[in-house]
């Protein structure tokens, strides 16, 4: 499935209902990934300006949580307003499915600590980047007096398992060239080779 959803460009009422339905269908196995996204597409296609993005993101996220936890929710916000909206069924997980943030900038990492339940490192970031981000997160968690043991971390990793190491590298380079327009990124952020070699790394 997708790594993160962008709450800034979604209707939060419809999104809350869709995610709650997924949690019901999966019998409580949903983890919600949210991200800030890049500004250019959001402004050009959805009319969300740079100065609105942060406020829309937080407001949308708060609406999700309100609809998941309250019998009837009322919101008087900057971007969305509604009165006594009931959403059923509620998620299986209580109070709601864990919300993990995808972020790499300090402001996004702080947002994750303030509003999230976990964090995932981007697949396009290197191991060195990941270590740096984890260090910042640990600091922000400490400043917020949050227990790091209750804030799980993860990293998406691109892997090509093939006993022919050269062929595995070619496949990754081709995929990164198509997806990111940067074939060399594959070498910086991926694992490839036999199963044993990948596990060893």
Task: Report residues per predicted region.
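Active-site-adjacent structural elements that line small-molecule/cofactor binding pockets in enzymes
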Residues: 1-201
């Amino acid at each position: 499935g997708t790594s993160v959803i962008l709450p800034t460009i979604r209707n939060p009422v419809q999104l809350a209902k869709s995610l709650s339905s997924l949690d019901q269908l999966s019998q409580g196995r949903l983890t919600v990934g949210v991200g800030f996204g890049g500004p250019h597409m959001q402004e050009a296609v959805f009319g969300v300006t740079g100065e609105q993005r942060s406020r829309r993101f937080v407001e949308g996220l708060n609406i999700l949580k309100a609809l998941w936890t309250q019998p009837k929710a009322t919101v008087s916000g900057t971007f969305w307003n509604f009165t006594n909206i009931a959403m059923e069924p509620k998620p299986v997980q209580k109070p709601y499915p864990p919300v993990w943030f995808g972020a790499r900038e300090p402001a996004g990492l702080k947002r994750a600590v303030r509003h999230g339940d976990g964090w995932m490192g981007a697949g396009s970031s290197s191991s060195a980047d990941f270590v740096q981000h984890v260090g910042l997160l640990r600091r922000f968690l400490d400043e917020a007096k949050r227990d790091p043991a209750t804030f799980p971390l993860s990293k998406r990793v691109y892997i090509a398992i093939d006993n022919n190491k050269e062929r595995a590298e070619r496949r990754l380079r081709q995929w990164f060239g198509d997806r990111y327009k940067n074939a060399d990124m594959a070498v910086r952020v991926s694992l490839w080779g036999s199963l044993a070699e990948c596990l060893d790394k």
